[in-house]
């Protein structure tokens, strides 16, 4: 079974997807982290001038995904963790993900991971493009100020003001919604949930009744 959770940044997708996967004993795949991994690798000096086709044909990054562990990202042999949370990487990932070659490459990987077992996929086009026939589709929204407060917790203290981050989030929304290749849209048949004033437990209470009873 595939469950998709889509929505813009700061709506609580990652926290919800992890909690839902843990509750159901499903695998969890953070596809945003996959795009940020590509962006991080592309920003490294040795790879900035390499043609995109060559970069993707012999990538300096890799992923580990199995029933025993969530998605892990590597640059060479080094496990990437905090590197993927920087605003520079996030901003470049937004630009880089517009490339049709990049999206096709990533979507192929994501579909391969779906064969491993029951999975919760989190991203921006999971229910609309990658898994349009997913059994359960969730689309999260939240007020911009709430989203900015949440994202600030992931950034080094003092690196950005709430107002500046909120402006960046709104600009990212517009870019995601207006890109020609797989824009951010509410998937057909998706359940839309505003997470602004809800806890993760309250959101789970809305979602679990959508799951077949033998899996909950």
From Swiss-Prot:
Gene Ontology process terms (BP): nucleobase-containing small molecule interconversion; pyrimidine nucleotide metabolic process
Q: Which HAMAP family match?
A: Cytidyl_kinase_type1 (MF_00238)
InterPro entries reported in the protein's UniProt record: Cytidylate_kin, Cytidylate_kinase_dom, P-loop_NTPase
Q: Name one GO molecular function term.
A: (d)CMP kinase activity
- What family does this chain come from, according to its entry? Belongs to the cytidylate kinase family. Type 1 subfamily.
Q: Which reaction does it catalyse?
A: CMP + ATP = CDP + ADP; dCMP + ATP = dCDP + ADP
EC number, as in UniProt: 2.7.4.25
Sequence positions that bind ATP: 7-15
Q: Which UniProt keywords apply?
A: ATP-binding, Cytoplasm, Kinase, Nucleotide-binding, Transferase
A Gene Ontology cellular component where this protein is annotated is: cytosol
Localization of this protein: Cytoplasm
Name listed for the protein in its UniProt record: Cytidylate kinase
In terms of NCBIfam families, this protein maps to:
cmk (TIGR00017)
């Amino acid at each position: 079974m595939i469950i998709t959770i889509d929505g813009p940044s700061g709506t609580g997708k990652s926290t919800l997807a992890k909690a839902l996967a843990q509750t159901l004993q499903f695998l969890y795949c953070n596809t945003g982290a996959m795009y940020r991994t590509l962006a991080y690798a592309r920003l490294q000096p040795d790879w900035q001038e390499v043609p995109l086709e060559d970069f993707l044909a012999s990538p300096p990054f890799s992923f580990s995904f199995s029933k025993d562990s969530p998605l892990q990202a590597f640059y060479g042999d080094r496990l990437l963790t905090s590197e993927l949370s920087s605003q520079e990487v996030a901003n470049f990932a937004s630009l880089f993900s517009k490339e049709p070659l990049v999206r096709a490459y990533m979507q192929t990987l994501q579909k391969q991971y779906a064969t491993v077992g029951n999975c919760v996929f989190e991203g921006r086009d999971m229910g609309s493009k990658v898994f349009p026939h997913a059994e359960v589709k969730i689309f999260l929204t939240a007020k911009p100020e709430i989203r900015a407060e949440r994202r600030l917790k992931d950034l080094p203290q003092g690196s950005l003001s709430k107002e500046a981050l909120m402006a960046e989030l709104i600009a990212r929304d517009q870019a995601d919604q207006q890109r020609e290749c797989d824009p951010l849209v509410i998937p057909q048949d998706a359940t839309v949930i505003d997470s602004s004033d809800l806890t993760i437990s309250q959101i789970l209470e809305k979602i679990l009744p959508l799951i077949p009873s033998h899996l909950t």
